[in-house]
Amino acid sequence: MKIINAAFIRSVSALQDLPDERVPEIVFAGRSNVGKSSLLNSLTGRKGLAKTSSTPGKTRLLNYFLINDDLYFVDIPGYGYAAVSHTEKDAWGRLLAGYVGGRQAIALVVLLLDSRHPAMESDREMMEFLAYHDRPYGIVLTKDDKLTQKERAKAKRVTASCALNAEFIVSYSSISGKGKKELLAHFDHYLSGESSGAGSDSAVTVT
């Protein structure tokens, strides 16, 4: 895939406000402050497309970005931030459960993990949630540039040991762009309908 153009379209706070399902969606999920906005900006080559914040838990909406006029990237609220109120967590939980559980347009979920702290309890819970809803997902290990070669290898081993249903695991640096080509190739694979199914031996790749 080559991204020619990208534009922010809308923020959604309720399921009834979702766009129609004629356009496929790739969903970006992960813990608060894992680097979703930085990843989206890196993938699209648009530095300010997704607003980055140093405040965990700031993204509270489903943010839609139109890619090449025929695909949505959807940035969903981060999880695992303790300072958020129970009321807000409950509201986010209902929104995400309804969206991930019922949205037919979702082609793939990209689950971002901090490569320095991969597979935390909340990450494993999200993997179980996606598997329960039979959603194909791949793993992106963010902030790869902060690790040594030995630490990178360990992060991949730890992730692979618990992400048994993941279709792929890609190490990514939003600073250098490492992993961008591989990740976009995986997107092409899913959008073309060539995926062989979550968790199959032929589908899981580590790069």
Curated annotation (Swiss-Prot):
SUPFAM superfamilies the UniProt entry points to: P-loop containing nucleoside triphosphate hydrolases
Cofactor: Mg(2+)
Keyword annotations of the record: Cell cycle, Cell division, GTP-binding, Magnesium, Metal-binding, Nucleotide-binding, Septation
UniProt xrefs under Pfam families: MMR_HSR1 (PF01926)
InterPro entries xrefs: G_ENGB_dom, GTP-bd, GTP-bd_ribosome_bio_YsxC, P-loop_NTPase
Every EngB-type G domain range: 22-193
Binding annotation for Mg(2+): S37, T59
Keyword Metal-binding among record annotations: yes
GO BP: division septum assembly
HAMAP family, sorted: GTPase_EngB
Family: Belongs to the TRAFAC class TrmE-Era-EngA-EngB-Septin-like GTPase superfamily. EngB GTPase family.
PANTHER family associated with the record: ENGB-TYPE G DOMAIN-CONTAINING PROTEIN, MSS1/TRME-RELATED GTP-BINDING PROTEIN
Protein name, per record: Probable GTP-binding protein EngB
Species of provenance: Chlorobium luteolum (strain DSM 273 / BCRC 81028 / 2530) (Pelodictyon luteolum)
Gene: engB
